[in-house]
Structures are given as structure tokens and as C-alpha cells.
Amino acid sequence: MPQEFPAIRLVALDLDGTLLNREGHVTPRTRAALQAAVDKGVYIVPATGRPLASLPPEVAQLPGIRYVITCNGAAVWDLGADPVGAVYSRYSNAKEHRTSTPVCLLHSLMPVETAREAFAVCESCHADLRIFSDGYACTDAHSIALAAARAAQKDSTEARQPNDGRFTILRDAAEWMSRNAFAIEKLCVFFEDPQQAAAALPRFYAVPGVEVVQGSPKNVEVTAAGVDKGEAL
């Protein structure tokens, strides 16, 4: 007899290169497939390395979206009845949008001293640095300038995100870290080329108590040890 499998209850989807096409959009075919799954009672759960603020509104508007795994599994959010408003709540220009309050169901933060040590390595790279904290995508003016220059190179959809308010621009990232090292979900550095990223990897691996991965050959992502999307699921 053919083996019977239990009905699918949940579909977890990465964003870049999976749910999103190369232009950073959800295709009509994908949208229709998701709607068919939702009609059968299946949960659709985006699982991404991005923070909540960087979940595209186009994704938050998809049918069935309520729960989302962010920062490689460092945070799991319940977006409630207004997923788009929950995402906008983490924008720097949140007052310009209708917002709602998301609930964090799981938070696996970096230990304070670990976050400080990892941040010091990030700073020494003099590259495009992103700090993810409480759903916010924090960066600085130098990093935004590097990101703008890189956008023309058609890097990954994550690296080419528009600055539409989803980024919180810090005047001084080091000073901010001195006050908020206790609340770090993830640190992410985008380099100019894969060789620079590969050269930096050993220094990140040397930091005790971290998980180090690469979402693309040009970046390095750091979270607390043990954090991954599978554990979050």
C-alpha cells in the first residue's frame, strides 16, 4: 500500500530567491499557490534572515500571513490581524503609517559581551553594517551610502532593499551599541566582494558564543550560538 503522510499544516518560506523573485516581488503563480494552501488551512510562515522592519509589505499582505521567523530564527513574531501595520511599527517613519503592535513569541538574543565583541569585529571591517534589534533594522549613514552604491550592481534582493523608512539611521553606531548591546538579535555585514567576506570569516568564528553564517558570498551574519530557522520553527 502507498505510504500515507499527514496533511501539510505549515509551509515555511525563505524570502530572497524563494518567495521573492530576482526583482524582489511575489509572482502571480506563487501568490495563487499560497492562496490554495491557505484555503486548505495551511499556515504560511516567512522564515528570513531579515528583521521584522525588512519584511516587505508585499509579503505581509499575502493571504494567511500571521507568524514570521526573522533574523535567522533569533525572533518569532505574531503579527496579529494587521501584519502590514505590524511591520510598519518598526519603520523609522512609523508615524506616517497605520501601525499595529506585533507580539514577540521567541527572542534568542546575543549575550551582552558577545554582542560587543562581535560588533567590534564588524566595525573593523569598515563595510556596510546592519544591527537588528527588537525588529528594527539599524544602520548608519556610511552604510547607507555603501548600500546605495551596491544597488546598481544588482546584488541580492536583501542587499538592494530600498530606504523607504525601513532602516533606522543611527548617528553613532558604537555609541548606540554601548547602550543597547543587551538587545541584539543579529549583526550583518555586507562586503564589496566574496573575497573580503571570506577573509573576515575567521575573525567572526573566533568570537565565542556566536552562530556565523553567510546568506550570500558577500555577507556575514552573526547571531547567538544555537540560533537557526529550524529551531525557531
Locate each region found by the language model.
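Asp-based phosphoryl-transfer active-site loop
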Residues: 7-23, 118
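Mg2+-dependent phosphoryl-transfer enzymes with acidic/Ser/Thr/Gly-rich catalytic loops
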Residues: 2-10, 26-28, 39, 205, ...
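Active-site phosphate-binding/coordination module
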Residues: 28-152
